[in-house]
């Protein structure tokens, strides 16, 4: 077993992990980021782009839509904080290099997403995941973050409710590594990947083993745009660009929120995305429509 010492250890390699690591290193912390998968596989966290009320006076509408779509079960303080930060996060990504789709005035183009009463979804078409991942990786490199892939977190080491470090398995070299650290950031996503063999929530497992209680485990993230018999997920933002969702008979499928849309699709004979009416906006989805 080898031993190392770092100021901050970040577990994960998606947008949340990369952003946390970059900011930590920028503020002077010696930062290590590890992922149980190969580096660059940030998952689909950025698939739907970002909801930012850039054409609204405040975040009130965004906040209310989020709470309503969550059937009033969301932590409303967290919703308020997140919707307040949305525009700043969009500005950060844009300044860092994400090329959002633009309108005729040259501003980020906003589309109306499922569950939103106003147009506030900004994205880069089917390049959203790639662009966000690439830009945040560049921020990590710029600030000196050390990143390692294929590192399986085994155990969180703590003493009297104080984190001391993490034991990991280096799957490249086949050895255990003891990492001493002042703080651990768990940002490797949830456990929803257990249904298709992708992300299974190693960070949540570490927390649970250490006696940290997990909240809201009954809420499971779900998308109605998964492709049958594959791990491919399409973005619902295509509907905002003019695509139509139909069943196999050509009848339109619609709903007020994602939960109802999932139910409508499951009750149909099958779902088809028709992109023939997208016009010039189809250029943003060249990978989805070939």
Regions of interest found by a model, annotated:
Residues 8-33:
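N-terminal Rossmann-like FAD-binding beta1-loop-alpha1 element of flavoenzymes
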Residues 14-15, 38, 191-192:
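Residue-level detector of alpha-helix initiation sites
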Residues 26-47:
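Glycine-rich FAD pyrophosphate-binding loop
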Residues 39, 212-290:
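An anion/pyrophosphate-binding glycine-rich loop and adjacent beta-alpha core
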Residues 44-45, 73-80, 90-107, 213-216, ...:
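A short alpha-helix-loop-beta-strand transition element characteristic
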Residues 52-82:
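Glycine-rich active-site loop/strand segments that organize a redox cofactor
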Residues 92-175, 180, 187, 226-238, ...:
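Conserved redox-cofactor binding core of oxidoreductases
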Residues 183-232:
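Glycine-rich loop(s) and the adjacent beta-strand/alpha-helix scaffold that form part
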